[in-house]
Amino acid sequence: MLLVMARPDATYWQDRRVTVTGGAGFLGTAVVRDLEQLGAQVSVIRSSQYDLRDPGAARAAVSGAEVVIHLAARVGGIGFNRRHPAPLAYDNLVMGSNVFEQSRLAGVGKLVAACSVCAYPKFTPVPFAEDDLWNGYPEESNAPYGLAKKMMLVLSDAYRREYDFDSCAPILANLYGPDDNFDLEDSHVIAAMIRKFVGAEKHGTPEVVLWGTGEPTREFLYVDDAARALLLAAERLQTSEPVNVGTGRETKIRDLAESIRTLVGFEGEIVWDSTRPDGQPARYLDVTRARELMGFEATTSLEEGLRRTIDSFASTLVGTS
């Protein structure tokens, strides 16, 4: 059982004007829900209304905010990353740069920009420690996205030194949870597996085909824990240094598949398609710094998080053929 650690401070958030870019997305929805429960005045920035690649749109988005939480991003799984490297690099880099500059010009008091574990070098020793972040190039399929997100740390440090602008860019582990993207074209591993296993169980399919060998390892952070970490970062993180946010627990992809199979109740065969890429060989985080600087520790076990996610996704299929 994971320990219960720090919770966001309602007195900090009460009536505070907070802008959340990507606030209608997967992680943003959880962040906005927590902020509203804490009494913040929340402005949700949607891509349909604000193209943050445009400096003018970014300026309008952050105007009047005391705190900005930047979550808007172009994201996808391994297949999407391999097909669309250019927009993953360009869109994420330009959106982040515009949000930093326009937040500074608008007099925002604190900017929290989500960074990603994909920023780490391909062959970083596990667990990933923040001091190893700059010791190599990311895994190739992740590099355009990972390096664009890594620039959030560069911008945070540069703006702090040049303008004394208070910002941080916590490095988030792989996220999962209800309301994730379950589209097989661009979903991440847990959402893709859940969709495949639930569909196979529902339709009586004898096997589920999964990408790769199943041998790589990953770390998975439940979305509600990630949302809490970002609010704690806004309150407590007074540095532009990288800070890992995760569970600090490693899970083999093959074991993840077995867990999801069991929870779904699928009794067929799992087939591993080794002609498909595995991605990075191993990935999980040393989370000591987050515990020390933010008082953060994840509280949702992988089994419980998977159960909630599966139940949520399955409920969307009720009545469908």
Over which residues does each language-model region extend?
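NAD(P)H-binding glycine-rich loop region in Rossmannoid oxidoreductase-like domains
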Residues: L52-L93, Q102-L105
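NAD(P)H cofactor-binding loop motif with strongest signal on the N-terminal glycine-rich segment
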Residues: G23
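Adenosine-cofactor binding site in Rossmann-like domains, unifying the SAM/SAH pocket
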Residues: E36, V42-A58
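Conserved beta-loop-beta element that borders a ligand/cofactor-binding pocket
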Residues: C115-S116, L153-P178, A191-I194, K202-V209
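Conserved Rossmann-fold NAD(P)-dependent oxidoreductase catalytic core, especially the SDR/UDP-sugar
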Residues: S97-N142
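Flexible, glycine-rich beta-alpha linker
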Residues: D51, A119-P121, C168-I190, P216-T217
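Active-site helix of classical SDR
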Residues: P144, A148-M151
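C-terminal substrate-binding subdomain of Rossmann-fold SDR/epimerase-dehydratase oxidoreductases
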Residues: T11, F26, V32-A40, G199-S321
